[in-house]
């Protein structure tokens, strides 16, 4: 009888996607060998838990094919593609252009309210320009990257990722324009983001989390504006506008 073995993540700290993907894939393949016979023990590759006990029968049939029964943290059932993804959202908000610009351009406070943003530090700043370092967390993984911001008060905030192991391309653009005529404390917010991960494995793993971050982004900034500037201007339902595009 095989000796009991248990491996766990302890003191994870900041792991890169490369480290985690490699470990998850290895554990998934290892767990594949024993799941064909549906033993009571479950092998959770995504949690980093290796099999605790293997019966003699499982050892004897270790070479048996188990393609259909295997499940790993990453799914390879479909073709691996790493195309650039784009998301855009337009909506009317009950805050002024200046108010929304101030919230979006204040990168230093992103860590307080932006989904999965663990750290945000402005390294340098001058009129119309800022350089910031951000740390994004997809539990239990943390990735750091540098972002260059172009600032045009109160119309534009553009951020471009210049380094980092996670993204081959990452660009976000916020545009603020006048809102509803007769409602001075309203504005039209156009948010767009495009991103492409450096590797296919990163793309397969991170898309699960990153898509959700993108979808929550505008709402997170709207809530932040409410916390700073108070209730938004009431907008009649027939004048409200909200449009989303995703590719």
From Swiss-Prot:
Family, per entry: Belongs to the COQ10 family.
Keyword Mitochondrion: yes
Listed PANTHER family: COENZYME Q-BINDING PROTEIN COQ10 HOMOLOG A, MITOCHONDRIAL, SPERM PROTEIN HOMOLOG
InterPro entries registered for this protein in UniProt: COQ10-like, COQ10_START, START-like_dom_sf
Gene label: coq10b-a
Family annotation (Gene3D superfamilies): 3.30.530.20
Topology relative to the membrane: Peripheral membrane protein
Organism, as annotated: Xenopus laevis (African clawed frog)
Protein name: Coenzyme Q-binding protein COQ10 homolog A, mitochondrial
Keywords on record: Membrane, Mitochondrion, Mitochondrion inner membrane, Transit peptide
């Amino acid at each position: 009888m095989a000796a009991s073995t248990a491996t766990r993540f302890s003191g994870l700290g900041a792991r890169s996607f490369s480290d985690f993907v490699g470990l998850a894939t290895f554990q998934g393949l290892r767990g594949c060998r024993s799941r064909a016979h549906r033993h009571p023990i479950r092998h959770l590759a995504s949690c980093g838990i290796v099999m605790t006990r293997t019966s003699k029968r499982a050892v004897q049939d270790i070479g048996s094919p188990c393609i259909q029964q295997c499940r790993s943290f990453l799914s390879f059932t479909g073709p691996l593609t790493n195309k650039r993804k784009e998301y855009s959202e337009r909506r009317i908000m009950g805050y002024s252009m200046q108010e929304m610009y101030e919230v979006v351009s204040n990168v230093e406070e992103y860590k307080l309210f932006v989904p999965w943003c663990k750290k945000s530090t402005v390294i340098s700043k001058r009129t119309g320009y800022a350089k910031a370092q951000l740390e994004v967390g997809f539990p239990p993984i943390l990735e750091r990257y540098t972002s260059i911001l172009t600032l045009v008060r109160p119309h534009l905030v553009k951020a471009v990722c210049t380094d980092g192991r996670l993204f081959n391309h990452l660009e976000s653009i916020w545009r603020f324009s006048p809102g509803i005529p007769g409602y001075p404390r309203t504005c039209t917010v156009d948010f767009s983001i495009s991103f492409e991960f450096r590797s296919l494995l990163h793309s397969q793993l991170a898309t699960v989390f990153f898509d959700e971050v993108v979808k929550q982004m505008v709402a997170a900034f709207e809530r932040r504006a409410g916390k700073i500037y108070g209730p938004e201007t009431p907008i009649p339902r027939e004048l409200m506008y909200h449009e989303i595009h995703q590719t």
